[in-house]
Amino acid sequence: MKKFTTLLLLFLSIAALAYSQKQKKEKTHPLDDISLNGLKWRSVGPALTSGRISDIAVNPNNFFEYYVATSSGGVWKTTNSGLHYEPIFDNENSYSTGCVTIDPNNSSVIWIGTGENNNQRSVSYGDGVYKSTDAGKSWSNMGLKSSEHIGKIIVHPKNSNIIYVAAVGPLWSKGGDRGLYKSEDGGKTWNNVLNIDEHTGVSDIVMDPRDPEVLYASTLQRRRHVYTYVGGGPGSGLYKTTDGGNS
């Protein structure tokens, strides 16, 4: 009788354990029923303030390809209309970009102005102008390293050696590379063709599509301190040139 009782208890224990395991298997998480196979991890930038888009440039010869400049997440490239993006600026000295421009004469030549064109406290600064001649595979710093914030780059539609750069200049200090810069040798040297003062930079430029010698430049006088922000001073204004920046 004692042997029978022991065997019965052993059988009941095994049955209870098997039932418990079955119950655990049947208890599934609600998300287990959702297919997540199509989702993949992706980088959204190295900083808390990432995600701000500074500029976008679309390849005029291939509308599936474009470049996205972010304020604190580098530069991204897509070759399939945005289905997938690849970071192409992560190995450079600046992760903040203010603008991206494709050479209208050669879509493999890309220009990047580092340092976002923004005046808020969490603004990220850059270290000048970068150029790629292989569609973003490699980069060279072309100068204007103390500009810190660049708003726009324009390449002459008929002459790739002529480039204009709108340099806003440092936000937290005076001086630096600020104003409208022009290069006539593909970015090897730069000439400041519109210099207002040590607190005023050029935030944007537009070229007349009918005449590349005609450009409009907007200037912005601003300075941020720990305790306040001063912006829109007398140096701010709108300028026009009809001779490619000579006057």
Segments predicted by a language model, with ranges:
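Bacterial Sec-dependent N-terminal signal peptides
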Residues: 1-24
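Beta-propeller blade termini and top-face loops
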Residues: 21-247
